[in-house]
Amino acid sequence: FVQISSIVAYGNSAEGELDEDHPVHADGGSYVLTKLASEHAVLAAQANGDIEVVIVRPGDAYGPGSRPWIIAPLEAIAKNQFMLPAKGEGFFRPIYIDDLVRGIALAAQHPDAAGEIFNLSCEGYMATKDYFAPHYEWLGKKGPMLVSTKLALRVSAIASKVANLMGNLNEASPATVVQLATKSWFSIKKAERILGWKPEMSFDEGMERSKQWAADNGLLGK
């Protein structure tokens, strides 16, 4: 059984390079809590001998169809409603969806993977302003809009209250703002050593495929 967790399990306050032995930390809201609870449940099942499990913690998965990192940002940028906290200097750890799926498949099949936790992310990181810059280029807009984390949190909190009153979902929640201001990245040496996995898709090629998908689905206007 493969449990799809997330790098958010490490919490948003940790800094530097984190491997799978780094303590988890519930400081990112309900999303983080659900990931930690599910990890606890499957590890308990493994310890009890009920089932063999593997936990994978994906990085910031992007590519065609990605709601949080392709679709939602494009929609917000088109409406001039997108801003980056930490002046765009937060760390983004992009992993293309095909590389992620390949890593999950290897984790499910490898005989030495049972009971293990694997980070499936890129090697290193990039600034959030560099990740989102192509989105602006695709739409023919200048940006990204870079603000302090404090200001971004204020705006996000207000937007969330308005969205709740109207029965809508605010995808740029305070938790998302905090996530985009983090200063951590993730070691993938364990996945390389045990699974023989590492990312193959270059960022430029991954974004080009994402752009084509976005254009084909009417997200880039006429």
Describe the role of every protein-language-model region.
Residues F1-S30:
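Conserved Rossmann-fold NAD(P)-dependent oxidoreductase catalytic core, especially the SDR/UDP-sugar
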Residues N12, G28-V54:
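Active-site Tyr-X1-5-Lys
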Residues L36, G49-I51, Y62-A72, D98, ...:
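Glycine/proline-rich active-site loop of Rossmann-fold NAD(P)-dependent oxidoreductases
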Residues A45-F92, I97-D98, H135:
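NAD(P)-dependent short-chain dehydrogenase/reductase
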Residues G63, P85-G90, F118-Y125, Y136-L139, ...:
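Glycine-rich Rossmann NAD(P)(H)-binding loop
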Residues I97, A133, A157-K198:
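Conserved C-terminal active-site "lid" loop/helix of NAD(P)H-dependent oxidoreductases
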Residues L106-A172, D204, E208-K211, K222:
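Mid/C-terminal beta-alpha module of Rossmann-like enzyme folds, strongest
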Residues F186-R193, K198, S202-K222:
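Amphipathic terminal alpha-helices
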